[in-house]
UniProtKB/Swiss-Prot annotation:
Residues annotated as binding ATP: G62, R123, S124, G153, D154, G155, S156
Protein known as: ATP-dependent 6-phosphofructokinase
Function: Catalyzes the phosphorylation of D-fructose 6-phosphate to fructose 1,6-bisphosphate by ATP, the first committing step of glycolysis.
Free-text description of this protein's post-translational modifications in UniProt: The N-terminus is blocked.
Binding residues annotated for substrate, in chain numbering: S199, I200, D201, R236, M243, G244, R245, E299, R326, H332, V333, Q334, R335
Active site: D201
Interdomain linker: annotated segments: 427-437
Gene name of this polypeptide: pfkA
Species annotation: Dictyostelium discoideum
Length: 834
């Protein structure tokens, strides 16, 4: 490499061509540092009052949808903390070739809804050599970066840890080579590493879900849902091949979510003679009335001898057995596309947590690399290499054919879903004797996507446990009228992919006029347990039934349980409710389209979403869409708030912003309605921007259930029967009353009295809501603080956030080419790899 002068960017300028705004002290020789010059003078001087940290983010390995939201959240949270943030372009190649560019607030604007990674990714052969890693260390030190966030798979994270462990020795070599001064080792003693797993395979230990896995599953379900219609028409058998390498999560999740007949995954190879077992299972389905068959093959599927099982082999075997079989290999369609709500959410939360880790940790803590993961809806930190080594051990276990251990290493959720699939696909029934107990399911409240998959799992798992299954039509009103039918195995065939509610739902609840009719119906059908799957009205209904136990002794012999099935996520005993994920995906789809229309004409949109008195949908859609403001009842709306927000939008549009987005919950305020807010902003901003209002309405309740709503409703039903079995074993009869739901990554039971105390009847929501702090988080990372007159979100060294970090005009920026120019347009965010 030729000797050239380059710039260490210390925040005083971002021009790579040596213009006058660059601090000349930051010029160094690429091959040699002047020993008399202190490279770190600015940093050492500032340590006495406020050390300015410098951090970088890179994406490596295969891309996944959700990487961009993670980059956005990390970069902006770092800026709010007072640090300087850089992007390493093209993965580890960028470290080796010094393709490290500074980011400002506008650099990551508008990327939250984009798939892939705007900073590029690559697999680097040079980085695998020690010489390549030495160049990477030099380039990091040259830019005074000693905190690195790596977003990628286990290989990328292993590479980051290797760089960390070699850091000191590589610095010593650079000093010996004369490229760095000795005092550099004193000021850069360690390289701090944080990792976020970006992988569609969901193959990493230490997190419930990896960034990109939910979007990939969505792509698979969209394809399979489309294929099923043609398969049913022609009575065909389809073999679907999905990605996954050594991990069968995508095949397993899509198998559970679509009601597939058979899956082949590397973690649990089928027994010898599996071909005939598969054919027999497909034949049983056809004899039961199914018009199509579905086999899902993970690309890494093997048999017990370690021999690969290909989709072509499966298809040929089925054809030999007389099936009209077809293959669909989904390929890279699984990897791309707009991120789902969940991928945007977890990526945003993990990006913020990574920034907090670099700032909140002690020196000793920073010496140990961490993996930022998710447990339920919250972030967790785990030892990076412990998670990587555990993950990589799975490949060895598969190679050694220790298959009994593989599923256990994958984790409890993987094992649970595999057992659920085996039961629901009729591959292995318990064949237990009938318990002679009737279990009834009904819906109450508004319709929610996920109700039909729930009923399917409820029915099949219940039959598998030996219960007699019943379905009640039209909620508690239907129960009073005796509208009950027994549910059989094939009654719910195909329900896993259906939106709406086949059993029907309404908002009626038990009362003095119908309670005796309800009890008569329960006695006539010999019901021992009631599961209400629905919304807040349903919880009021089961609370009312529980109250009637004092007057009607018959109810004391019946278990009454509520399960969350509402888009509003406003019921007690759970962090999330089934249906809210589908609703948020519908909302984000609409918001993305609205934002595209707004860009063309400098427009501010005021969008109203459902949720009644609960602001969950508004808060979450704001966090994951990049909306500047969200208005919810829990925080209230005042005239002062609206005035400050109006000032903020005026300032933003004055600075050539082309779009603004406000999301309002439908009952956020009785006085300041959606139309009032629209009228106010339209009148005051008419010379700068146009304003439109949009009420999304019932599109939020419809649509095919999302992957998460399908598989989590199934998981919820599996735990419901575990609770029933434990209750039966402990007391000899069913007597549990309360609700079940998702709390802290698990499924928990809440007793009835505790559930009732948690409910706010006035506002029809839980008294305590876990997500409230995220409203402020969303606002903080969406609006440049110097644009926001109400901003109080500066921390620590916030004085370092200046006008230089503000989005600037397009004419001031040059566009990049790979490994060359070190700046890019921070306003329009071009795909760097194009």
């Amino acid at each position: 490499m030729t000797t050239t002068s380059k710039i260490i960017n210390d925040g005083e300028g971002e021009d790579v061509k040596g213009n006058k705004n660059i601090n000349k002290k930051s010029l160094i020789d690429e091959n040699r540092l002047d020993e008399k010059k202190d490279l770190l003078s600015d940093k050492v001087e500032s340590k006495t009052h406020c050390s300015v940290k410098r951090m970088a983010v890179l994406t490596s390995g295969g891309d996944s949808s959700g990487m961009n939201p993670a980059i956005r959240a990390f970069a902006r949270q770092v800026m709010l903390k007072g640090a300087k943030v850089f992007a390493v372009r093209e993965g580890y190649n960028g470290l080796v070739n010094d393709s490290i560019v500074p980011l400002n607030w506008g650099s990551v604007a508008g990327i939250i809804s984009r798939g892939g990674t705007i900073i590029g990714t690559a697999r680097s052969a040079e980085f695998r050599t020690r010489e390549g890693r030495k160049r990477a260390v030099f380039n990091l030190v040259k830019n005074r970066i000693d905190n690195l966030l790596v977003i990628g798979g286990d290989g990328s994270l292993t590479g980051a840890n290797l760089l960390r462990t070699e850091w000191c020795s590589l610095l010593e070599e650079l000093v010996k080579d004369g490229k760095l001064t000795l005092d550099v080792m004193e000021h850069f003693p360690i390289l701090s590493i944080a990792g976020i797993v970006g992988s569609i395979d969901n193959d990493m230990c230490g997190t419930d879900l990896t960034v990109g896995a939910d979007t990939a599953t969505k792509r698979i379900l969209e394809a399979i849902d489309s294929i099923l219609s043609t398969a049913v028409s022609h009575q065909r058998s389809f073999v679907i091949e999905v990605m996954g390498r050594n991990c069968g999560w995508l095949a397993l999740a899509s198998g559970v979510a679509t009601g597939a007949d058979y899956i082949l995954i590397p973690e649990s190879p089928p027994d010898d003679g599996w071909e005939q077992t598969m054919a027999d299972n497909l034949e049983r389905g056809r004899l039961s009335g199914r018009r199509c068959s579905l086999v899902i093959v993970s690309e890494g599927a093997i048999d017990r001898q370690g021999k690969p099982i290909t989709s072509a082999y499966v298809r040929q075997f089925l054809e030999d057995k007389g099936h009209d079989a077809r293959i669909t290999i989904l390929g890279h369609v699984q990897r791309g596309g707009t991120p789902t709500f969940l991928d945007r959410y977890i990526a945003t939360r993990m990006g913020i947590e990574a920034a907090n880790y670099f700032y909140d940790s002690t020196i000793e803590q920073l010496k140990q690399p961490v993996l930022i993961g998710m447990s339920g809806m919250d972030t967790i930190r785990s030892p990076l290499m412990e998670c990587v080594q555990k993950t990589q051990s799975i490949a060895s276990l598969i190679k050694e054919r220790r298959f009994n251990e593989v599923v256990d290493v994958r984790g409890g959720m993987f094992k649970e879903f595999y057992e659920i699939f085996i039961a629901c696909s009729n591959l292995h029934r318990r064949k237990v004797e009938s318990k002679g107990m009737g279990v009834l399911i009904l819906h109450s409240g508004g319709p929610s996507p996920g109700m039909n998959p729930c009923v399917r799992a409820f029915t099949r798992l219940g039959i598998d446990h030996g219960y007699t299954m019943y379905g009640c039509f039209n909620g508690f009103g239907g129960l009073a009228l005796g509208e009950i039918e027994q549910l059989h195995w094939m009654t719910v065939n195909g329900w896993s992919v259906m939106g709406g509610a086949e059993l029907g739902t309404n908002r009626s609840i038990p009362n003095d006029s119908n309670i005796e009719a309800i009890i008569a119906t329960l006695e006539r059908f010999k019901i021992n347990a009631i599961l209400m799957f629905g919304g807040f009205n349903g919880y009021l209904g089961i609370a009312k039934l529980y109250e009637y136990r004092e007057k009607y002794q018959q109810l004391k012999r019946i278990s009454i349980i509520g399960a969350p099935g509402t888009i509003a996520n406003n019921v007690p005993g759970t962090n999330i409710s089934i249906g809210s994920d589908t609703s948020l995906n519908n909302t984000l789809d609409a918001l993305d389209k609205i934002k595209q229309s707004a860009v063309a004409s400098r427009r501010l949109f005021v969008v109203e979403v459902m949720g009644a008195h609960c602001g969950y949908l508004a808060a979450m859609s704001s966090l994951t869409s990049g909306a500047e403001r969200s208005y919810i009842m829990e925080r209230g709306i005042t005239l002062n708030t609206l005035t400050k927000d109006l000032e903020m939008f005026v300032e933003r549009f004055k600075r050539e912003h082309r779009i603004g987005l406000i999301i309002k919950s439908e009952l956020a305020s009785n006085t300041y309605s959606t139309h009032f807010i629209y009228s106010l902003f339209k009148e005051e901003g008419k010379h700068l921007f146009d304003v439109r209002e949009s009420i999304l309405g019932h599109l939020q309740q419809g649509g095919t259930p999302s992957a998460i709503d399908r598989i989590f409703s199934t998981r919820l039903m599996n735990h419901y029967y575990q609770f029933l079995e434990n209750d039966l074993k402990e007391h000899g009869h069913l007597q549990m009353n309360g609700c079940i739901g998702f709390i802290d990554g698990g499924i928990h039971y809440t007793p009835m009295q505790e559930m009732i105390e948690e409910m706010s009847d006035k506002f029809r929501r839980p008294r305590s809501q876990w997500w409230m702090d995220l409203v402020e988080t969303s606002q903080n990372i969406s609006v440049f603080p110097l644009d926001d007159p109400s901003s109080t979100n500066f921390e620590g060294c916030n004085s370092n956030l200046s006008e230089q970090d503000r989005p600037i005009k397009k004419s001031d920026i040059s566009s990049p080419t790979s490994y060359s120019q070190k700046t890019f347009d921070p306003n329009v965010n071009p795909q760097f790899t194009l």
